Amino acid sequence: MSAGGPCPAAAGGGPGGASCSVGAPGGVSMFRWLEVLEKEFDKAFVDVDLLLGEIDPDQADITYEGRQKMTSLSSCFAQLCHKAQSVSQINHKLEAQLVDLKSELTETQAEKVVLEKEVHDQLLQLHSIQLQLHAKTGQSADSGTIKAKLSGPSVEELERELEANKKEKMKEAQLEAEVKLLRKENEALRRHIAVLQAEVYGARLAAKYLDKELAGRVQQIQLLGRDMKGPAHDKLWNQLEAEIHLHRHKTVIRACRGRNDLKRPMQAPPGHDQDSLKKSQGVGPIRKVLLLKEDHEGLGISITGGKEHGVPILISEIHPGQPADRCGGLHVGDAILAVNGVNLRDTKHKEAVTILSQQRGEIEFEVVYVAPEVDSDDENVEYEDESGHRYRLYLDELEGGGNPGASCKDTSGEIKVLQGFNKKAVTDTHENGDLGTASETPLDDGASKLDDLHTLYHKKSY
């Protein structure tokens, strides 16, 4: 038994891990340090487990008790990682608030000094004008004469009036400051609620996938217990494996669709109606899309997945106004099987980014569409709160930015829905290397049968 299971879940699946991308730069180094510490713990955990395995079988009680204690240590370490991330997040939040308060205090002190100087200058100008006025009227006036003209009660009334005006202005200023502070807190709380909603949506996706993953693995275990060998066993095993990876594929696509604009509903490719997709487990026919890309343009798409994540190279986002959006032949959820004859089925993520960024001129994509809504009990249900807002995995106002029209580069680390059950997080990378006009040519539907699904999905268990 290894500590690799609970630790990554605590290090990446908790509230701290989910919001580390919006933290201060110091938080990034802290999480890197925590990741190194976690790897060292896993290594030591495995070494101790191997040592316990070398104990004589006659002393199995010692081995069992030792592994129970190691399980407790692993659980404690996972909780410690989670608490450390939470404390780090709170610390960075307090540091940011402290910086803001210091800045506001400095501005307030500076304004106070400036106002005092202005009042002093205004008083000097007032006295100067009064002396000039008396000189023009032929009256000799000094400070004593001016004071003598003012009776006692009038001076007191003037002071009371000034004090009353000061109190009224102070009340108005305090109310304005409180309103400003409350608006600032409201904005921060709304952002925090949006992050929590994203975590809930991601957790529901992960739980949904884990449920189907567990069902598939149970069927495989049952298959191992049956007396079945030869081609029939291999065919059934590959069929179960293909279903598991198909559900993983659909989960990633739902995560990708969660970040798209709600005002632009996702459209399936032409000819992909619900009835035909249901017959093929939601997998459409293989299509070829021809594009023309100028040298100064990017593809205008974002990709995710790869061999290391157990899913094919997927189109996770199509940027509006970019060549991929203008051509209309590519869709979110398409798995890129090949580009210009280069097979991408067994390609890792970075390799796919490199291959796509090197394409110039006329580009031929070989893609297959997978509909996440098909063959599922509640895929068509929108996750909405009481106000009617759908839970979205990504919110534009929470993302730090990133120009979708920039040149091709890999900004991995966006999708973390599957991080709780896979130590390698599915990384959504922006691949912006671009396309021009396109035409779409449907091909044979031979790859859409369930028996052949394992040719589209990697048989990688974790």
From Swiss-Prot:
Gene from which the chain derives: GOPC
One Pfam entry name: PDZ
Subunit structure of this chain's protein: Homooligomer. Interacts with FZD5. Interacts with FZD8. Interacts with GRID2 and BECN1. Interacts with CSPG5. Interacts with CLCN3. Interacts with STX6. Interacts with CFTR. Interacts with ASIC3. Interacts with GOLGA3. Interacts with NLGN1. Interacts with RHOQ. Interacts with MARCHF2; the interaction leads to CFTR ubiquitination and degradation. Interacts with ADRB1. May interact with CACNG2. Interacts with CCDC62. (Microbial infection) Interacts with C.rodentium and E.coli (strain Sakai) NleG8.
Expressed in which tissues: Ubiquitously expressed.
Chief localization: cytoplasm
GO biological process: apical protein localization; endoplasmic reticulum to Golgi vesicle-mediated transport; Golgi to plasma membrane transport; negative regulation of anion channel activity; negative regulation of protein localization to cell surface; protein transport
Function per UniProt: Plays a role in intracellular protein trafficking and degradation. May regulate CFTR chloride currents and acid-induced ASIC3 currents by modulating cell surface expression of both channels. May also regulate the intracellular trafficking of the ADR1B receptor. May play a role in autophagy. Together with MARCHF2 mediates the ubiquitination and lysosomal degradation of CFTR. Overexpression results in CFTR intracellular retention and lysosomaldegradation in the lysosomes.
Domain PDZ: 288-371
Domain of life: Eukaryota
Region ranges (Disordered): 426-449
Swiss-Prot/TrEMBL domain comment: The PDZ domain mediates interactions with FZD5, FZD8, ASIC3, GRID2, CLCN3. Also mediates interaction with CFTR and ADRB1.
Keyword terms: Acetylation, Cell projection, Chromosomal rearrangement, Coiled coil, Cytoplasm, Golgi apparatus, Membrane, Protein transport, Synapse, Transport
Name of this chain's protein: Golgi-associated PDZ and coiled-coil motif-containing protein
Coiled coil: 83-200
Reported disease: A chromosomal aberration involving GOPC is found in a glioblastoma multiforme sample. An intra-chromosomal deletion del(6)(q21q21) is responsible for the formation of GOPC-ROS1 chimeric protein which has a constitutive receptor tyrosine kinase activity.
Subcellular location, record wording: Cytoplasm; Golgi apparatus membrane; Golgi apparatus, trans-Golgi network membrane; Synapse
Molecular functions per Gene Ontology: identical protein binding; molecular sequestering activity; transmembrane transporter binding
Sites bearing N-acetylserine, chain numbering: S2
GO CC annotation terms, alphabetical: cytoplasm; dendrite; Golgi apparatus; Golgi membrane; Golgi-associated vesicle membrane; lysosomal membrane; membrane; plasma membrane
Site (Breakpoint for translocation to form GOPC-ROS1 fusion protein) residue list: Q419, G420
InterPro entries attached to this UniProt entry: GOPC, PDZ, PDZ_sf
Membrane topology: Peripheral membrane protein
